[in-house]
Regions:
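Conserved anion-binding
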Residues: 2, 66-121
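Hydrophobic faces of well-ordered beta-strands that scaffold small-molecule active sites
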Residues: 3-9, 31-33, 58-62, 86-88, ...
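Short beta->alpha connector loops
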Residues: 11-14, 37-39, 91-94
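Short, acidic/polar
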Residues: 12-23, 68-77
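Short, well-ordered alpha-helical microsegments
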Residues: 17, 42, 46, 93-97
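Surface-exposed amphipathic alpha-helices with a cationic face
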Residues: 25, 46-53, 97, 101-105
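Metabolite-binding pocket within alpha/beta catalytic cores that recognizes anionic/polar moieties
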Residues: 32-85
């Protein structure tokens, strides 16, 4: 049985992220790929992370925030990764959040209301 824990793969490089993901495969429920890792390693990197942890769900923490049309386009661009969970920023509003949820019906959409650290902004 896996623990309902998500490991944040905020690693310095893809190799380290894959090693960390593999280490928790079957133990933790999710691996979390954030914006920095996604932009650095791209969809192919995320696919490598998924392959390293095939028993973990993919939590894609991109915090999408734009007009609804653009959010849908961004969500569709990651659809091939089959994220189990995708984050959007709550400030995008109901229309944006609902549009992403409709565009990716197999993905849970979580709205982030406050960033972890506002002091660094």
């Amino acid at each position: 049985m896996t623990a309902p824990i998500a490991l944040a793969l905020d690693a310095p490089d893809l190799d380290t992220a894959c090693r960390w993901a593999n280490a928790v495969d079957g133990v933790f429920s999710h691996v979390k790929v954030g914006l920095e890792t996604y932009l650095r390693d791209g969809a192919l990197g995320v696919a490598e992370i998924r392959a390293a942890a095939p028993h973990c769900a993919l939590f894609l923490d991109l915090k999408l925030h734009d007009i609804p049309n653009t959010m849908v386009g961004a969500a569709r661009s990651v659809a091939d990764l089959q994220p189990d969970l995708l984050t959007v920023h709550a400030a995008a509003g109901h229309a944006g959040i609902a549009a992403v949820a409709e565009a990716l019906p197999q993905t849970k959409v979580a709205a982030v209301t406050v960033l972890t650290s506002l002091s660094a902004v």
